[in-house]
C-alpha cells in the first residue's frame, strides 16, 4: 500500500514525509469521526462465479468445455464495499439503484440479512440489474489453480432516468450533515453522473464531512476536490502511461494537482 499527499515534513526524506503526512491526516480523520454512520453512493451489481473442470475442447470450435462443479453468487461493486464497512463495525448507508428483477431483489435480501442499511436503494421498474458472471476452470487432477475462461455481463444500456438520479442524490444530501464520511463508488454505470457527484462533494465540504472516492479511470473529473482517492496499482500504472510520467510518484503528483485531491491511496491488490 502506497500513499501520496501534498504535505512535507522537515527532517524526513520526501517519500517518508509523504507517508507520514498521509498517515497523520488519516489518523486525525478517524479521531474526528462523530458517528459510525458512513454514506456510500454508487453502482450496485451482482457477482457470479461458476467453477468447474475444463478438460476438453469443443468439437466444433477451439474453446474449452467447462463442466460446472459449483457456483457462488455475491453482491458486488458498491454493495460489496458496504458489506466491508459493516464488517469493520461501521454503520454503512448504501444509496444506489437496482432493477425490479430476481438479481436486484436477491441483492437486497443478501444485504439485509447481513444488517446493511438498504433504505437508500431505489428499485426501478423495467430495469435490469447488472450481473457479472465469471467462468473459472482448471484441469481435473492438476494442482494448478483456476483460470478465468470467460466473463459474461448482463447490463442495462438505457440511461437511468434523470428523475431517479435526482431523487437518489437529494436523499443522500439530506443525510450528509449527520454522517462521518461520504464514499463515492463509481463503476461508470450511471448512478454517479457529473452533476450529482459535484453536488454531493460540495455539500460534504460545507459540512466538513470527508469524501473518499473510488473512481472509474474514465470518470476522474467526478472526483474533483475529494479528500481521499483509492487507486489500484494497475490503474496508477495505466495513468502513468497516459500522462507520460516517468514514475508512479510523478503520475500521482500530477493527478493530485490536476484533480485537486488531498490524498491518493494506492492498493497493491493481494499484496496489500
Question: Where do the protein language model's features map onto the residues?
Answer:
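Short amphipathic alpha-helices and their capping/turn segments at secondary-structure boundaries
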Residues: 23-38, 171-174, 203, 215-222
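Short coil-to-helix leader/linker segments, especially the first N-terminal amphipathic alpha-helix
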Residues: 4-32, 202-204
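Structural beta-sheet core signal
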Residues: 40, 94-96, 213, 266
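Conserved phosphate/ATP/ADP-binding segment of small-molecule kinases
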Residues: 191-272
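Generic enzyme active-site microenvironment
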Residues: 41, 183-184, 212, 230
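Active-site metal-binding loops of divalent metal-dependent hydrolases
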Residues: 43-44, 187
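Conserved N-terminal subdomain of the carbohydrate kinase-like
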Residues: 13-20, 38, 46-183
